[in-house]
Design a protein with these regions (language model features):
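Short amphipathic alpha-helices in soluble, non-transmembrane regions
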Residues: 39-41, 73-81
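Bacterial Sec-dependent N-terminal signal peptides
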Residues: 1-23
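Axial heme c-ligation environment in periplasmic c-type cytochrome domains
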Residues: 60-63, 91, 95
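Charged, low-complexity intrinsically disordered tails and linkers
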Residues: 3, 26-31
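N-terminal targeting signals for Sec/Tat export/insertion, comprising classic cleavable signal peptides
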Residues: 29-63, 67-68
C-alpha cells in the first residue's frame, strides 16, 4: 500500500515538473554553422534547456523553464552575441564583432 502512495507522489511530481517547460520559436538572423553554435550557446547560457537553430528558416526552437528564464532574456543574450532576433536587434558593435562569414544583411528588429 505504501508503494502505491509513493508511486502516486512520484508521478504527480514528475508530471508537474514537465508542465513547467515552455517551448517557443523565434526568428534569428544568421548565416552558417558557426552562427548556429553561437546562437544556440547564447540561448543555453541565458537559461534555455534546449536550443536548435535552423539556418535555412532562421528559426530558433527553444525549450525553457519559465521560473528560470524568459524569451526576453534569451533574445537579449542572442542580440548581445551579435545576432538580430525578431524583437531585439544586436548593437552595431556586437554585430561588427561577428566573423565575416557570420555578418548577414540586417533585416531584423529595429534597435530598442
Amino acid at each position: 500500500m505504501k508503494y502505491i502512495g509513493l508511486f502516486t507522489a512520484l508521478t504527480l511530481f514528475f508530471s508537474v515538473n514537465s508542465f513547467a517547460q515552455k517551448t517557443e520559436e523565434i526568428k534569428v538572423w544568421g548565416n552558417c554553422g558557426m552562427c548556429k553554435k553561437t546562437i544556440e550557446a547564447a540561448a543555453i547560457k541565458a537559461g534555455a534547456k534546449t536550443a536548435n537553430w535552423n539556418k535555412d528558416s532562421k528559426v530558433l526552437n527553444v525549450e525553457f523553464k519559465e521560473k528560470k528564464t524568459d524569451m526576453q532574456k534569451i533574445q537579449q543574450a542572442i542580440a548581445n552575441a551579435g545576432y538580430d532576433t525578431q524583437d531585439i536587434a544586436a548593437t552595431a558593435e556586437a554585430y561588427g564583432n561577428l566573423a565575416e562569414c557570420c555578418q548577414y544583411p540586417r533585416k531584423g528588429a529595429e534597435k530598442k
